[in-house]
């Protein structure tokens, strides 16, 4: 189990994580959503022990994570950027094998062949999507007990996305893998996660289970220009403004959302994935 209690972090004088609480159950998949600047990446860097909190506690298997080598060896972390790109996938694998006693060479070979990656080529010549696949091959070959992913399918084509999700779901079912996924795409998470947490201004504001997400949680973009509008009849989980356009995640039925917004004659109104 991953448990975060009262996590607090200040960076450059700004409160990034504000007494945050969350829990990820063993063998479950938890989706973490929130606007840019909400603190998703900072939270993840605490969960994997890269950053030390100013206050609060982070436990995995009831043990603190920071400077805990044994716990870190059980964590697989795939970030938005890959490191050590000046060497080949094969050379990276040798490093991972030395670092992780649970390294599975047979699985590594299966994965890079499945994703059709050349293990002898330098990773720096790979496209962004290929680098993501390379990271996935390496991390999944460590046979992690906890998998933490920051925008894991960004830049992947549809076939690669399906393969990534297949391996993750299979490991959850077969090995009781525990997964936390940070994503901006609500629809992408819909058929994958057991729960979703909405991170906003450094706090988990709302949590939902999968069935509830499918029927009551909707992401929209809307613009009314300079017109004053009233959205008090909608339960807005969070909102993000991009000029005159608002990005909203709303906890409500789609029919009520269409009625409340449609009655106010929006210039733009789209249901987003």
Task: List where the protein language model places each region.
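Conserved structural motif at the start of ABC-family nucleotide-binding domains
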Residues: 2-4, 17
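The feature captures the beta-strand-to-loop junction immediately N-terminal to the Walker
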Residues: 30-35
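Helix-to-loop junction immediately C-terminal to a conserved catalytic motif
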Residues: 48
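Conserved ABC transporter NBD signature motif
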Residues: 56-67, 71
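ABC-family P-loop ATPase nucleotide-binding domains
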Residues: 77-134
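Catalytic Walker B motif of ABC-type/P-loop ATPase nucleotide-binding domains
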Residues: 147-151
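ABC transporter nucleotide-binding domain
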Residues: 165-252
């Amino acid at each position: 189990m991953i448990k975060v209690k009262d996590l607090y972090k200040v960076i450059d004088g700004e409160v990034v994580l504000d007494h945050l609480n969350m829990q990820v159950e063993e063998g479950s998949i938890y989706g973490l959503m929130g606007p840019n600047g909400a603190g998703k990446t900072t939270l993840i860097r605490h969960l994997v022990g890269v950053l030390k909190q100013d206050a609060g506690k982070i436990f995995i298997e009831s043990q603190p994570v920071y400077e805990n080598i044994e716990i870190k060896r059980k964590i697989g972390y795939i970030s938005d950027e890959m490191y050590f790109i000046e060497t080949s996938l094969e050379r990276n694998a040798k490093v991972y094998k030395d670092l992780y006693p649970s390294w599975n060479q047979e699985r590594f070979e299966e994965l890079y062949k499945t994703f059709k990656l050349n293990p002898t080529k330098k990773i720096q010549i790979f496209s962004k999507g290929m680098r993501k696949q390379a990271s996935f091959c390496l991390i999944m070959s460590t046979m992690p007990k906890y998998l933490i992913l920051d925008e894991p399918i960004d830049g992947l084509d549809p076939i690669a996305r399906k393969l990534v999700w297949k391996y993750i779901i299979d490991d959850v079912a077969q090995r009781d893998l525990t997964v936390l996924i940070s994503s901006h795409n609500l629809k992408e998470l819909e058929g994958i996660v057991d729960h979703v947490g909405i991170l906003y201004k450094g706090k988990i504001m709302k949590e939902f289970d999968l069935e509830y997400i499918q029927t009551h949680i909707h992401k929209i973009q809307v613009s009314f220009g300079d017109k004053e509008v009233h959205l008090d009849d909608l339960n807005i989980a969070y909102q993000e403004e991009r000029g005159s356009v608002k990005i909203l995640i709303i906890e409500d039925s789609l029919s009520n959302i269409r009625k409340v917004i449609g009655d106010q004659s929006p210039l733009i109104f789209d249901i987003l994935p």
